[in-house]
Design a protein with these regions (language model features):
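A conserved mid-protein helix/loop that constitutes part of the nucleotide-sugar donor-binding site
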Residues: 22, 208-231, 241, 248-254
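Short acidic/histidine- and often glycine-rich active-site loop of Leloir-type glycosyltransferases
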Residues: 127, 315-326, 330-331
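Short alpha-helical donor nucleotide-sugar binding micro-motif in glycosyltransferases
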Residues: 149, 271, 279-285
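Nucleotide-activated donor-binding/catalytic signature segment of Leloir-type glycosyltransferases, i.e.
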Residues: 254-272
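A short, well-ordered alpha-helix in the C-terminal region of glycosyltransferases
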Residues: 265, 352-366
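Aromatic "clamp/platform" in nucleotide-sugar-dependent glycosyltransferases that forms part
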Residues: 293
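Short hydrophobic beta-strand element within catalytic cores of glycosyltransferases
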Residues: 310-314
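Conserved acidic donor-binding segment of nucleotide-sugar-dependent glycosyltransferases
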Residues: 325-326, 330-336, 344-350
Length: 383
């Protein structure tokens, strides 16, 4: 098998930080380290420095749409960009966003005649509803999205639930589950690192610590968590809770926690871009609370598992697809009463938490190297 050159196209890429940008970075890294070649194509961004990547990054003209969609949207009709891309001997185009990136990918395919793959990462119906309020325009945006995706030779989704969501938008083609990975190695960080991240917080020994890492948005199930913690406190159960992250709803979330009288045991800290700091938080916690039905893959659940930390998830959610209740994680109904009842029980069962955390590491952890190598094997079939 000869070395391949893969074109990776996405709307977001560092310095923009989101789950899909992280996926593209890891695809580029793992493909390059395997001996193949990767080229990332992404919109220009003010102050972006791509010199630290081990693969080429081609930036094309963009429009600042931060207020609407949270990032700079690419302008996919740049002839100069197309001429630059045509100089690369691409064997396959792998697109990770169904909007401007997909338009660019389709135009490039029309020029160089190579196969295309699309990965569906996000429930775009929710993003569309948040960005566009007119129902008729929402339906038009969904149709455009589905038309773009349907044009690819093969469609991947990061979970079965993501595939079902794509089907609900009107997509009628086939899809294949290709899960994303985690950029953490299996195992814990040194205890000195754990003590360093939590030294400014009141986290007594022998008191269970719950954790959330991610965007501070209500649709992540944060109200369920806070209401459950209120019930836990009223029931006299000792605990601490740490939220790590930022997001558009953070101020409201903090205010609601204070309103519930949880300020003495629920703490908020800003997002951490040092991955070892995030790993240290996973290692300090006793249980990860993630009652989100929005996420298509729940990578944070696999990150937690890398550090032997079990998660509480909503039964039937995408994040819970690989979870067996009480074996490698814990499942609840999508309400605060269900979470509170489980936490009240687990607060007094530290050995159960440790056992289930170890099993989570064994059963649901997948590294980015393994995930991308699986993708590369599939590339060969598509090519």
């Amino acid at each position: 098998m000869s070395n391949r050159t893969i074109c990776l196209i996405n709307d977001s890429f560092p310095p923009v930080t989101d789950g899909v940008a992280n996926a593209v970075v890891n695809y580029g890294r793992a493909i390059t380290e395997s001996g193949d070649k990767a080229v990332v194509v992404t919109p220009a961004y003010p102050g972006a420095d791509d010199s630290g990547f081990s693969f080429p990054v081609v930036r094309y003209p963009s429009i600042d749409m931060t207020k609407l969609v949270g990032y700079h949207a690419g302008f996919p009709f740049s002839e100069k960009t197309m001429q630059t891309l045509m100089e690369y001997p691409f064997d396959l185009i792998h697109c990770h966003c169904p909007i401007t990136s997909a338009v660019l990918a389709r135009e490039l395919r029309a020029r160089i005649h190579v196969p295309t793959v699309f990965t569906y990462h996000t429930k775009f119906d929710i993003d569309i509803a948040n960005a566009i309020h007119a129902k008729l325009l929402q339906e038009g945006a969904k149709k455009l999205l589905v038309d773009n995706i349907s044009a690819f030779d093969e469609v991947w989704t990061v979970s079965h639930g993501a595939g079902e969501n794509l089907r609900s938008l009107g997509y009628q083609g086939d899809w294949r589950v290709m899960p994303n990975g985690v950029d953490f190695a299996r195992g814990r960080v040194p205890e000195t690192d754990v003590h360093a991240v939590c030294r400014d917080f009141d986290l007594p020994e022998n008191v269970p610590v719950f954790l959330f890492v991610g965007r501070m948005m209500w649709y992540k199930g944060l109200r369920i968590t806070l209401d459950a913690l209120k019930k836990l406190k009223d029931g006299g159960h000792p605990f601490r809770m740490v939220f790590v992250g930022s997001g558009g709803d953070k101020d409201e979330v903090v205010a609601y926690a204070n309103e519930l009288g949880l300020a003495d045991r629920v703490f908020f800290t800003s997002p951490k871009y040092d991955r070892n700091v995030i790993r240290a938080w996973y290692c300090r916690a006793d249980l990860f609370l993630f009652p989100s039905t929005f996420d298509t893959n729940g990578l944070v659940v696999r990150e937690a598992a890398a550090c032997e930390l079990a998660s509480v998830l909503v039964r039937g959610s995408c994040a819970a697809e690989d979870i067996t209740d009480g074996k490698n994680g814990f499942l609840i109904e999508e309400n605060a009463d269900s979470m509170a009842a489980l936490l009240a029980k687990l607060c007094h069962e530290p050995e159960v938490l440790k056992r289930v955390g170890r099993q989570a590491q064994e059963e649901i952890y997948i590294s980015w190297d393994d995930a991308v190598h699986r993708a590369q094997r599939r590339y060969e079939i598509v090519i």
